[in-house]
Every structure is written in structure tokens, then in C-alpha cells.
Amino acid sequence: MQIASGGVSDVGRIRTDNEDCFRIVAPLQLFVLSDGMGGEAHGEVASALAVETVTKHCLDSRENHATPLFGEVQASLSDQTKRLASAVHLANKRIFEAAEGHLEQRGMGATLTAAWIDGAKLSIAHVGDSRAYLLRSGTLQQLTSDHSLVAEQVRRGIITAAEAEESQMQSVLIRALGAQPEVEVDVEEHTLFVRDILILCSDGLTRMVTEPEIAGTLQAETNPTRAAEKLVALANEYGGADNVTVIVIRLEPGSRKWFSWLRRGARSKAASNGSGGGKLDG
């Protein structure tokens, strides 16, 4: 299979800082997205630390299988999924320790959604309310579960999905990186097929753009970066209430070759204002 990918991050229409962060590591077929929280730029610190830690741990463990695993990892999982879950556990540890060690960073945290592809095998690791979707044969399937208060209330039948969309508690998370010394990491393993499309996104997209609109955009635009740009533009057109980050991954017929594009609507973390963004490793 041939894989094409692209990512876009934008500050939105309301916020002044971008606390989202993402990274595409093309040679490793690794995609990582994080949405920081904590205010006063500390959300940016948390999301950047999450993405950096997960990426480095996956790289290290791929090169050296003796790299120790962190956290509780199911024995039945593939080695790749174990390494990815371990990376997220380590990211939680790093963020928690950073917050505990710096008074001004107390309370910072982050979501984390990562996808790692090896041939036709997909590993997903997830904490928080950023999402991973799979579009297959015109049907959009959410691969992750939101770790938010309203999502839990919907699962328990306390409120309806429609009520959740109107709730003022949508931003309240019940699970995030850095909140506790240990975190439960959701993992998924899937088999991919030619013409599958994956999308990772922060809640700045899913709170503004409907799933049918997401699916329609992915089907209409074959260039992954332009698809991501169009989804970000839709979120901003509908109000841009939050930072919005989108990674699109297309599995296409052909030789196993990488084509990756990256554009950012927000300035990179290297810029003077420290706003969020993304990075492509190719």
C-alpha cells in the first residue's frame, strides 16, 4: 500500500494561543496529536511534551527492542501496540512530574491520540477527548471513546447525545495525561485496507463540524493536506471556538511509499509567541 498523509493546526477564531500539537513521523508511519490544557501557555508545554515523549519512545523502542516498557500493558497486544501504549504511559509520567516540579505549571495536562501503522496493522493509543476516525466504504467510524464527563453521562444513560452537544460541561475531562501519577490508556488494534482513510483530530474540529461533514470532505478531497485544510476552514467558518488540529492519512493502491505534506495555520512552537503547531519528519 501507498500512504499519503498531511496535517494542519490552527489557533481558531477565539483563542490567542494554540495549545494543540502534532507530529507526523513518515519513516516510522507514526502519527501523534495532543491538545494541551492548563492556561497561561502551560497547555502548550503539556501537549509539546506529550508529543515529544511519545515520538521519542516509539523511535527508541523500534530501534532497540530492549527499551523498557512503562505502565500496565496487556500481554496479548502486538509488540508495536505495547510500545505505543508504553510511550503514552511515559508521557503521562513526564507531564505529571513537570507539573509537580514547577508551581506555575500545576494543573497542566493534555489529551493524546496516536496511530502507528505497520503494513496493514494499525495500533491506536488514546487518552482524553481528541479522536481517531476510520472512513471505510463511505462509513465513518469513531475508533476512540471520549474521556469526558458528558460522554460518560451519555454512556450511563444520564443524558442523551443531543443533550451532551448542548452541555456547558463538554470541556470537562475525566481522564487526561498529567492529571495523576498513573493513567489508563485505551488501545485499539485494527487491520487496514486499501482506500481506508484515517483522521486524528482535536475537539476543536468535532465540536464545530458534524461527522457527515467530516466524511463528505474526506471523500471529496483526495489530497490529505487539502482535506485537513478544508476541515479546519469549516471549523473556523462555524465559529472557530477552539484550536483545531487535523491529521489525514490515506491508504492507496501502489508501492509502499510515503508522500507527506504539512501546512500549519498557526505559527510553530519555534516562533516567538510559542503557539502550537505540527512537525513532519520525513
Predicted regions and their residues:
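PP2C/PPM-type serine/threonine phosphatase catalytic domain
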Residues: M1-G282
